[in-house]
From Swiss-Prot:
Name of one Pfam family that matches: MFS_1
PANTHER family (alphabetical): INTEGRAL MEMBRANE EFFLUX PROTEIN-RELATED (PTHR23513), MAJOR FACILITATOR SUPERFAMILY ASSOCIATED DOMAIN-CONTAINING PROTEIN (PTHR23513:SF6)
Chain ranges on the Cytoplasmic side, renumbered to this chain: 1-13, 78-85, 134-142, 198-228, 286-293, 342-354, 398-435
Primary localization: membrane
Keywords, sorted A to Z: Cell membrane, Membrane, Transmembrane, Transmembrane helix, Transport
Topology within the bilayer: Multi-pass membrane protein
Species this chain originates from: Bacillus subtilis (strain 168)
Positions in the Extracellular compartment: 35-56, 107-112, 164-176, 250-264, 315-320, 376
GO molecular function: transmembrane transporter activity
Lineage start: Bacteria, Bacillati, Bacillota, Bacilli, Bacillales
Top-level taxon in the UniProt lineage: Bacteria
Full protein name: Alpha-ketoglutarate permease
Length: 435
């Protein structure tokens, strides 16, 4: 028993709520299954008969499904609880994948491809983002920044690192179709760990005599009832514009200065490796220096500066691989400066944390549309330099907006006391930690 308590103490000290550790492990395994198709599914479908436009439309439909699912995940958790919401996400992924792989791809029937892949797209936000909402409810405020940092570490590690790494070996060994089927093993294993091994009890703040439809509508109305939450959603949308926009035009721009596709891919991959490490670091920094200050200076200002540096460095010094690698890594680190936003937003709406997290998750989805849209609209008339300045200006604007995301001391004290009481009732681990 002492060994178990010791492990719980260690996990809490590094920022992982010990009573939710199996949920974190479940998320990373689930996201491996979701991310294993990155980089090769579109070329595979084109090789089997789709046009490039049809493939682009397929992924656009998928993105729409992801955005809607992400937006609603928080209010679903607040209304029905995280286990039910995550179970719906797991089933959507499994059913959508089965239809997509087992029937739509063999027949290459385009409407079926659109519908089944969109159903699959509903899955991971309902699963992963609902767990993030769960974390925001069940974690003490003094480690909440680190706790959400660990969530984004697990999420990104599975989606952008382990998933593609696994498929780089699985596709040559088993083929594309069997690799897609293997995703179900990962999501099932992750689902079992997060839903059944994770013993935390969820206790949402209940509203008396409020119909469920009104609770669900909070995902939209909270942005007007609490403008700070709406501002936070805008900041979150700006967060990843570089992540979704750079890949469209930077490789072509860098090629003018002698950077090969291979060098670009190495720089891009290393950027995200640094990012997942700094997700944890800036989670801890946010708990020490303040969530708002971390997002504003390290996230907004940092991303703005290194966005400009990525563009101007090749012009100033030409082909210098390691210099550009260092700058890209600095951008990846600054990108993680936005991590405390996941702790800040639910604290701005202590009575509607689920709705606040829905707005945060909506921002996560919207940037996947807005960034390519900016590139497509302005790359022609303004060129790469114009797009870079638009991105940098948006990052600096997000830093300005973050100034308004203030929390009153009174709300913070009430929230901390509520968290303290709930955790002592819920888990033996936290009871030990608090003693």
């Amino acid at each position: 028993m002492n060994t178990v308590h010791a492990k719980g103490n260690v996990l809490n000290k590094i920022g992982i709520p010990s009573h939710m550790v199996w949920g974190y492990i479940g998320v990373v395994i689930f996201m491996v299954g979701d991310g294993l198709e990155q980089g090769w599914l579109s070329p595979f479908l084109v090789d089997h008969g789709l046009s490039m436009q049809q493939s682009a439309s397929l992924f656009t439909m998928y993105g729409i499904a992801v955005t809607i699912s992400a937006w609603l995940s928080g209010t679903f958790v607040q209304t029905w609880g995280p286990r039910k919401t995550m179970t719906v996400g797991l089933l959507a992924f499994i059913l959508g994948s089965a239809a997509f792989i087992g029937w739509a791809i063999p027949h290459m029937y385009y409407p079926a491809l659109l519908g089944s892949y969109a159903l699959r797209g509903l899955g991971y936000p309902l699963f992963a983002y609902s767990f993030l909402v769960w974390v925001s409810y069940s974690t003490s405020q003094n480690i909440l920044g680190k706790a959400v940092g660990w969530f984004w570490f697990m999420f990104t590690c599975g989606l952008n690192v382990l998933g593609p790494f696994y498929s780089s070996y699985a596709v040559p060994a088993f083929g594309e179709i069997n690799t897609l089927w293997s995703a179900l093993l990962f999501v099932a294993a992750g689902g079992i760990l997060a839903l059944f091994f994770n013993k935390d009890k969820f206790t949402p703040i209940q509203k008396q005599d409020q119909p469920k439809w009104k609770e669900l509508s909070k995902a939209f109305t909270i942005m007007f009832e609490n403008p700070k939450v709406g501002i936070g959603g805008v900041v979150k949308t700006i967060n990843a514009i570089g992540q979704f926009g750079f890949a469209i035009f930077l490789p072509t721009y860098l090629a003018r200065y002698g950077y090969s596709v291979s060098e670009w891919l190495q720089i891009w991959g290393t950027l995200f490796f640094v990012n997942i490490v700094f997700n944890i670091i800036f989670g801890a920094v946010g708990d020490k220096l303040g969530w708002r200050n971390t997002v504003m200076w390290f996230g907004g200002v940092g991303c703005g500066i290194f966005t400009l540096a990525l563009y101007y460095t090749p012009q100033l010094i030409g082909h210098q691989y390691w210099v550009l690698m260092i700058i890209a890594c600095c951008y990846g680190a600054a990108l993680a400066g936005y991590v405390p936003l996941s702790a800040l937003l639910p604290t701005l709406a202590p009575d509607n944390k689920g709705a606040a997290m829905s707005v945060l998750n909506l921002g996560s989805g919207l940037c996947a549309f807005i960034a390519p849209g900016i590139v497509s609209l302005f790359i022609g008339p303004l060129g790469a330099g114009g797009v870079i300045w638009i991105f940098a200006a948006l990052y600096f604007f997000s830093a300005f907006l973050t100034r308004f995301l203030t929390i009153s001391e009174q709300s913070t004290d009430v929230y901390t006391e509520e968290r303290f009481v709930r955790e002592n009732v819920q888990t033996n681990f936290d009871k030990t930690v608090k003693q």
